Amino acid sequence: MAATTTTSSSSRIAYSRHNIPGLHSDSLNPKSISFSSNLHTFSLKSSGSRRQLYSRRTGAVVIMQSMDKVEVDISLSPRVNSVKPSKTVAITDQATALVQAGVPVIRLAAGEPDFDTPAPIVEAGINAIREGHTRYTPNAGTMELRSAISHKLKEENGLSYTPDQILVSNGAKQSIIQAVLAVCSPGDEVLIPAPYWVSYPEMARLADATPVILPTSISEDFLLDPKLLESKLTEKSRLLILCSPSNPTGSVYPRKLLEQIAEIVARHPRLLVISDEIYEHIIYAPATHTSFASLPGMWDRTLTVNGFSKAFAMTGWRLGYIAGPKHFIAACNKIQSQFTSGASSISQKAAVAALGLGYAGGELVATMVKSFRERRDYLVKSFGEIEGVKISEPRGAFYLFIDLSSYYGVEVDGFGSINNSESLCRYLLDKAQVALVPGDAFGDDTCIRISYAASLSTLQAAVERIKKALVTIKPPVPV
């Protein structure tokens, strides 16, 4: 069967002006990233003869025009139609395509450490292959790894979990979505402080739950106001998702604030908490990390999520985990058994080696964190010198979430209007050839996210490009 494909113009995110040779003509056309809906022309062979069947889309049905009329329903489920594609993935993919086409784009959109996986971890993975550890593992993960995670949580986080209260998955993202699916019923509410990681609201929608967004402000370092949380709680409130250190802001919740939040949570029997702690080791003193489940009364209602991608530079190894009360972990385990089954045996052997590097990853992780801190300090200083920029200094992770809204409401010759974070990021890609993520992807349209998971020299070049591009924009005089 041969098929030719054309693309509808629905479902697109305005973003780029570059035409890339060899790619679909609409996938990187001026100002757009496209998510295609396909129309097909089918060519079939039958009884030695060939009939052309041309299709057109009518609503959600493809009408096959031939001697025989066949209708094929290509509609998608309401669930998947309610979910937005990830902007961070789309922008990262587009920036990569531009680079491959010869456009010298500096990519600061992806949340991926630029360091190689530490050598002892790599060696453990290689040895796993050589020694024949290449078969299926138990769905929940190997006992060796779950025991190592149990020890880590006890020593580093003050949390007591047995191996059967831990589930290893193909990345922390899988751990989170399985938890949301396990505890949420249709109509339940999932409370999410904004700015948020792009996937949290979509995960709630996939579970037929309703995301309830709790806005924060840059003046308060993007930290959740406990009073706002309490005002938004209803009988439908089922889940609160916390991320500290935060993607996209780098904010770190101090213990005192977490205790205030815990006091509110304790008054609501239905309310559970997912504590996303994937960036726990990428933290800058004097900030410290507190696991939410370690607070009084919170162990029974908290699902702690972590993984190996960020601190150990193991993004491609795809390994995360969740720990919590056995009742909830068993439910997540059941879902995983029907989704993916167990995670990679090779990655699990490598993860055991990662946890064996020492407390908080030892010197290898400390060296990476030192570099991240130097980069953060450079960016905070550099952007602090630019007129109209507001900054909340990150205390962890490797993102700078800066307010550039003073540059909105401007018409730029040869480009057009800059009215929001998306058009500003598109302008910076077009004018400065720097790929960033608009803040509206994270629930705050006043800001843009810059990943400093790149070398200092790369960041210096990016800052110079951004400064030159912003010079042509005259920010409105503050009232």
Curated annotation (Swiss-Prot):
One of its GO terms (molecular function) is L-aspartate:2-oxoglutarate aminotransferase activity. GO terms for biological process: aromatic amino acid family biosynthetic process, prephenate pathway; L-phenylalanine biosynthetic process. Pyridoxal 5'-phosphate binds at residues 172-173, 247, 279, 307-309, 318. Expressed in flowers, pistils, stamens, ovaries and at lower levels in leaves and sepals. It is found in: Plastid, Chloroplast. InterPro entries: Aminotransferase_I/II_large, AspAT/PAT-like, NHTrfase_class1_PyrdxlP-BS, PyrdxlP-dep_Trfase, PyrdxlP-dep_Trfase_major, PyrdxlP-dep_Trfase_small. Prokaryotic-type aspartate aminotransferase. Also has a prenate transaminase activity. Involved in the aromatic amino acids biosynthesis pathway via the arogenate route. Required for the transamination of prephenate into arogenate. Can use 2-oxoglutarate, oxaloacetate and prephenate as substrates, but not phenylpyruvate or 4-hydroxyphenylpyruvate. This is Bifunctional aspartate aminotransferase and glutamate/aspartate-prephenate aminotransferase. The lineage of its organism: Eukaryota, Viridiplantae, Streptophyta, Embryophyta, Tracheophyta. The gene is PPA-AT.
